[in-house]
């Protein structure tokens, strides 16, 4: 095992106007599980492929342990990769697929089989070792792909959207499987996904990527509770945070949301007076009236009933919002719903920079740079 260091990584494809990746720096500790998450086209898979040696690096340094690996071939980097499409050899059995990389390294058959059997037991693949990939389900194929990576005993695991081809139930099962494996193996892991649920449930830390730039690095609860930018606030969460174009009033005590709607700021702050802001409210913080906080009126457009929770979609202060309510609340489309908002649940972002404004530093209107 080893730490993974990325320093000022940059990438531009020939003929492209802008870089795909710009000044990416991150330190991944020995044994840490880090998830890179972002929308399609943000550069996350390109970054993973650069770590693997499948893409060249324009600028910057990639180190695995203390070794600079920029110029090393993939086979010499001591990494193992799990792909979205499994990448299994169709003519080989499960056992042969899992042991093939060890065979190429020249290991003896006895040692290869020992490793394969050991990993097969961990992944509950013992009964499938003589089957071909076509005889396996999607979840079984992905477990074989993971097993093939594990038998190599690499310094770093790389996962490229490994659950994307699975249905929702299997994705949930495989998330638990990956969690369990990481607790057991404690191998340094870099995992790429567009799915924020995977990021929040699997990661020790999350790297949120957008348009080739890092928006925020932090633990899942930090990313969710204190998003560094309006982009992170909207992207992380299901549904994402409601964002309003807003402005502080001239006293710095209230937030003007539009259509005559206003809310008290968490703390009076004259330095914010008249300032244009983005205001954020998580769907679960639009509570049913009577649960504390200022009461606002939401016009209901539609309702999604999801069992324990109901999602109410509608208009508030002239802007589209979603509120997450308990199962018993079922407002009719076209009706008015009274919701309550506590001041401390507000998130504030600068309208121009989109950076977070911390409540604790609001007296100086400081921008968070974490």
UniProtKB/Swiss-Prot annotation:
Gene3D superfamilies: 2.40.50.100, Nucleic acid-binding proteins, P-loop containing nucleotide triphosphate hydrolases. Signal peptide: none annotated. It catalyses: sn-glycerol 3-phosphate(out) + ATP + H2O = sn-glycerol 3-phosphate(in) + ADP + phosphate + H(+). Keywords: ATP-binding, Cell inner membrane, Cell membrane, Membrane, Nucleotide-binding, Sugar transport, Translocase, Transport. Its EC number is 7.6.2.10. The keyword Translocase applies. One of its GO terms (biological process) is glycerophosphodiester transmembrane transport. Pfam families: ABC_tran, TOBE_2. Residues 4-236 form the ABC transporter domain. It is found in: Cell inner membrane. GO terms for molecular function: ABC-type glycerol-3-phosphate transporter activity; ATP binding; ATP hydrolysis activity. One of its GO terms (cellular component) is ATP-binding cassette (ABC) transporter complex, substrate-binding subunit-containing. It is a peripheral membrane protein. ATP binds at residues 38-45. The complex is composed of two ATP-binding proteins (UgpC), two transmembrane proteins (UgpA and UgpE) and a solute-binding protein (UgpB). Belongs to the ABC transporter superfamily. sn-glycerol-3-phosphate importer (TC 3.A.1.1.3) family. PANTHER family: MALTODEXTRIN IMPORT ATP-BINDING PROTEIN MSMX, SN-GLYCEROL-3-PHOSPHATE IMPORT ATP-BINDING PROTEIN UGPC. Part of the ABC transporter complex UgpBAEC involved in sn-glycerol-3-phosphate (G3P) import. Responsible for energy coupling to the transport system. This is sn-glycerol-3-phosphate import ATP-binding protein UgpC. It comes from Chromobacterium violaceum (strain ATCC 12472 / DSM 30191 / JCM 1249 / CCUG 213 / NBRC 12614 / NCIMB 9131 / NCTC 9757 / MK). The lineage of its organism: Bacteria, Pseudomonadati, Pseudomonadota, Betaproteobacteria, Neisseriales.
């Amino acid at each position: 095992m080893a730490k993974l260091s990325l320093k000022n990584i940059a990438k531009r494809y020939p003929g492209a106007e802008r870089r795909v990746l710009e000044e990416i720096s991150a330190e991944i500790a020995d044994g840490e599980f880090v998830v890179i998450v972002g929308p399609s086209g943000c550069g996350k898979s390109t970054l993973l492929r650069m770590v693997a040696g499948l893409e060249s690096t324009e600028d910057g340094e990639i180190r695995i342990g203390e070794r600079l690996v920029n110029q090393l071939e993939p086979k010499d980097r001591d990494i193992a990769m799990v792909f979205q499409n499994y990448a299994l050899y169709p003519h080989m059995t499960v056992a042969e697929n899992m042991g093939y990389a060890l065979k190429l390294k020249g290991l003896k058959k006895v040692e290869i089989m020992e490793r394969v059997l050991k990993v097969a037991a961990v992944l509950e693949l013992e009964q499938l070792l003589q089957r071909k990939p076509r005889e396996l389900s999607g979840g079984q194929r992905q477990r074989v792909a993971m097993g093939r990576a594990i038998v190599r005993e690499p310094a770093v695991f790389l996962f490229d959207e490994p659950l994307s081809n699975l249905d929702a139930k299997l994705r949930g099962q495989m998330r638990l499987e990956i969690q369990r494996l990481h607790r057991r193996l404690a191998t340094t892991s870099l995992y790429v996904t567009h799915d924020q649920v995977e990021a929040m449930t699997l990661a020790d830390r999350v790297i949120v990527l957008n348009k080739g730039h890092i928006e925020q690095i932090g633990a899942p609860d930090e990313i969710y509770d204190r998003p560094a930018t309006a982009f992170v606030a909207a992207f992380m969460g299901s549904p994402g945070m409601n964002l309003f174009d807003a402005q502080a009033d001239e006293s710095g005590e209230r937030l003007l949301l539009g259509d005559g709607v206003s809310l008290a700021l968490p703390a009076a702050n004259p330095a914010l007076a008249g300032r244009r802001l983005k205001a954020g409210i998580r769907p679960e913080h639009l509570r049913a009236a009577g649960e504390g906080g200022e009461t606002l009126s939401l016009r209901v457009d539609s309702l999604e009933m999801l069992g324990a929770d109901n999602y109410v979609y509608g208009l508030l202060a002239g802007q589209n919002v979603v509120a997450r309510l308990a199962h018993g609340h079922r407002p009719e489309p076209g009706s008015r719903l009274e919701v309550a908002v506590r001041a401390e649940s507000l998130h504030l972002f600068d309208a121009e920079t989109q950076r977070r404004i911390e409540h604790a530093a609001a007296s100086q209107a400081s921008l968070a740079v974490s």
